[in-house]
Regions:
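Long, charge-dense tracts
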Residues: 9, 18-145
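Long, contiguous domain-sized segments
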Residues: 71, 78, 93-104, 109-123, ...
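Aromatic-residue detector
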Residues: 13-23, 27-31, 43-45, 60, ...
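Flexible inter-domain linker/hinge segments
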Residues: 1-31, 178-205
Length: 453
């Protein structure tokens, strides 16, 4: 179960589905009271950028949308609703309109070096809304480079950015007008959730009693034949994100040192953790990697179990599960899906690295309606080991660790959709993908901000 904001009676809102719960506001509001939006756009996209900012502030397009009419405020999905604080437009001189569609970096850089940006109001938190001529997955190397350069330049001014592909945005807005619909609202909903996290808020959390344990995720992304490791430091068991660090593959000592700092920082606010849980993107070397970690724990006089949960990024297709009673409704009848309930798992037996398990991670929840449009993902493989303890891991502990992987797949704050992998793997991978494109390793001072979403 997930927990969101408050209802009209001041009670916590709990829901299985992110898309429904976010309408009650964030679990933890962004800490700023004055948030202002800066538009960054090509001159041909001026009107679309204007409509986009209007939608963020007012919850509607700002122009006649076919036969569609907003009849009451409950239908408006303003950005303020998702971040928990008021939103205004930035000062006129801060908006940036560029002419070079293929390489806007020079114009954006000149604007950021101008007087307006050198004298920003320190009492205001600015967010850049970048209507990009191309997206970060662009095939052209130079286009991709531009995307990341602009993101880094704004971060140097402590301004997180939310990007949207210009062509996709225009196509969706056009369809909405032609069909008198508001489907673009779902894109805005995802963007609102991401902006909340970029501003240090938590759109939703896990409905779990807080435990004295530390969860650290280590993931990787390979770019240009070099492998980078990004480590998301760290989470508590409710999903609260605390910190992150970034390393190259060869910097194992730095990685262990960062885990040490995460433990010390955690212990300075809470009691010492009762256990350390590491979600790892690959099999861990007992001799080369875990030994350094064990030595560090000994140095801290911390005699706690360390559970290594290896999470295979590739969905399992050689071994799958079926549920004969699993169905879903089509337009005409009831069809079999064969997909087990989300969170179900089975034991695949023991290997040299530990015990292997198969976890179903989808959107079929008990006592909830399943939508075929959510897809039918294959389960994922996990391996669980506790290298610094002898004997088998208790079944109850295994259940807790597997359920934690499943639950951490539900606090992905870039979308209201359930993910196949936990954020302990996805977030580090995202950091590792972005950082090689940045000139500086240190680009943002607020470590509680998920600026990379």
């Amino acid at each position: 179960m997930l927990v969101f904001g408050k209802d009209q009676n001041g009670n916590d809102v709990k829901n299985e589905r992110q898309q429904q719960g976010v309408n009650f506001g964030p679990r933890i509001k962004c800490p700023y009271t004055d948030v202002r939006l800066i538009a960054i756009f090509h001159e041909d996209d001026r009107d679309y950028a204007k409509y986009l900012l209007h939608y963020f502030k007012h919850g509607d397009y700002g122009f006649k949308n076919g036969n569609y009419r907003i009849t009451d405020d409950s239908q408006r999905k303003k950005l303020s609703q998702y971040i928990g604080t008021n939103v205004e437009y930035a000062e006129k001189e801060l908006h940036i309109e560029f002419k070079d569609r293929q390489n806007p970096v020079k114009e954006v850089k000149e604007a950021l070096e101008g007087e307006a940006y050198q004298n920003l109001d320190t009492n205001v938190k600015y967010v850049g809304i970048y209507v990009s001529p191309f997206h970060k997955y662009a095939s052209e190397r130079e286009q991709k480079k531009c995307y990341y350069q602009i993101k880094e330049m704004f971060l140097q001014h402590k301004i997180p950015t939310q990007c949207i592909d210009s062509d996709k945005m225009k196509a969706q807005q056009k369809r909405d007008v032609e069909k008198a619909r508001r489907d673009f609202i779902y894109t805005l909903q995802n963007m609102g959730v991401a902006i909340c996290a970029k501003l240090g808020g938590s759109p939703w959390l896990l409905d779990e009693a807080k435990k004295e344990e530390l969860i650290i995720g280590i993931g990787a992304f390979k770019s240009d034949d070099r492998q980078y490791i990004g480590a998301a430091f760290s989470f508590d068991n409710t999903g609260v994100f605390n910190n992150y660090s970034y390393f190259q593959k060869s910097e194992l000592d730095e990685l262990v040192g960062a885990i040490k700092m995460a433990i010390l920082n955690y212990s300075s606010v809470n009691s010492k953790p009762d256990r350390l849980i590491i979600h790892y993107y690959k099999k861990i070397s007992r001799k080369n990697e875990f030994q350094k970690l064990e030595d560090m724990l000994h140095e801290l006089s911390l005699n706690i179990p360390v559970y290594i949960v290896t999470i295979n990024k590739t969905e399992s297709e050689d071994i799958v599960l079926f549920d004969e009673n699993s169905t879903y409704n089509t337009r005409y009848n009831v069809a079999k899906s064969l997909m087990p309930y989300s969170g179900k798992w089975i034991n695949l037996g023991r290997t040299r690295e530990g015990y292997r398990y198969l976890l179903c991670n989808n959107t079929r929840y008990e006592n909830e309606t399943f939508k075929a449009t959510d897809g039918f993902p294959f389960p994922i493989k996990l391996t669980i080991a506790c290298p610094n303890r002898n004997g088998e891991i208790e079944t109850a502990v295994v259940q807790q660790l597997i359920d934690q992987v499943y639950q951490f797949s539900r606090i992905y704050w870039k979308s209201v959709k359930q993910q196949g992998l936990p954020v302990t793997i996805k977030y580090p991978e995202m950091i590792a993908e972005i950082m090689p494109h940045f000139e500086s390793k240190t680009v943002y001072t607020d470590r509680s901000s998920l600026w990379f979403l």
